[in-house]
Curated annotation (Swiss-Prot):
One of the record's GO cellular component terms: cytosolic large ribosomal subunit
CDD domains: Ribosomal_L7_L12
Record-given protein name: Large ribosomal subunit protein bL12
Gene Ontology process terms (BP): translation
MF GO annotations: mRNA binding; structural constituent of ribosome
Keyword Ribosomal protein: yes
Subunit structure as annotated in this protein's UniProt entry: Homodimer. Part of the ribosomal stalk of the 50S ribosomal subunit. Forms a multimeric L10(L12)X complex, where L10 forms an elongated spine to which 2 to 4 L12 dimers bind in a sequential fashion. Binds GTP-bound translation factors.
Family: Belongs to the bacterial ribosomal protein bL12 family.
Pfam families cross-referenced by the UniProt entry: Ribosomal_L12 (PF00542), Ribosomal_L12_N (PF16320)
Function: Forms part of the ribosomal stalk which helps the ribosome interact with GTP-bound translation factors. Is thus essential for accurate translation.
């Protein structure tokens, strides 16, 4: 069977965010690689100078759906833009990241929305 790049790209285009996430994880496991971007080494500013970088990207982790699962699914849909089935699967699969690599203010707002819906969520 010959590899057809166009068919592959079309298949990728039709996948949901959750399916793409599962694909990335499978590729990472299969080939022993990481999808994380490589950071350039920081230039040394002198001996003993400690550089403390403030974290700029945060992940919103749903740890538990809680008693009011319907409200949590609605909150997840608002935060992520996922469809009903994808949001339900994400909530059922807790603990899972709801959003990854977002700004601190957006992450805090998402955690607050999940907590208000009755879920247990963390900012990572």
């Amino acid at each position: 069977m010959a590899f057809d790049k166009d068919v592959f790209l079309t298949a990728l285009d039709s996948m949901t965010v959750l399916e793409l996430n599962d694909l990335v994880k499978a590729i990472e496991e299969k080939f022993g690689v990481s999808a994380a971007a490589m950071a350039a080494p920081a230039a040394a500013s002198g001996p003993g100078a400690a550089v403390v970088e403030e974290k700029t990207e945060f992940n919103v982790l749903l740890t538990e759906a809680g008693a009011n699962k319907v409200s949590v699914i609605k909150a997840v849909r608002e935060i992520t833009g996922l469809g009903l089935k994808e949001a339900k699967d994400l909530v059922d699969g807790a603990p899972k990241n709801v959003k990854e690599g977002i700004a601190k203010a957006d992450a805090e707002a998402a955690v607050k929305k999940l907590l208000d819906a009755g879920a247990k969520a963390e900012l990572k």
